[in-house]
Amino acid sequence: MATNDKTMFFDFGQERQEDIKQTLKTVYESLEEKGYNPINQIVGYLLSGDPAYIPRLNDARNLIRQHERDEIIEELVRSYLKNNGETK
């Protein structure tokens, strides 16, 4: 069995990043409106993939399911590092 020592490159476009940001904003606001802790609910969804963590209010559940969880996590990491001076 051959091993692949090359680093794989993963990237998606700026438009997709903005779409994910808008989706997260809508989901966050919907969770707050329902009286849930938005951070806990979003983390629950990202870890489990279970859409039941996200309400149907404002179409939040359908919106978040349009994105792969790894893309959402990538955008969260990018935003965190950018806002904490660690990356461009």
From Swiss-Prot:
Top-level taxon of origin: Bacteria
PANTHER family named among the record's database cross-references: UPF0297 PROTEIN YRZL
NCBIfam families per the UniProt record, alphabetical: PRK05473.1 (NF003997)
Signal peptide: none
Species for this entry: Limosilactobacillus reuteri (strain DSM 20016) (Lactobacillus reuteri)
Family that this chain belongs to: Belongs to the UPF0297 family.
Cited Pfam families: IreB
Annotated protein name in UniProt: UPF0297 protein Lreu_0534
InterPro entries referenced in this protein's UniProt entry, alphabetically: IreB
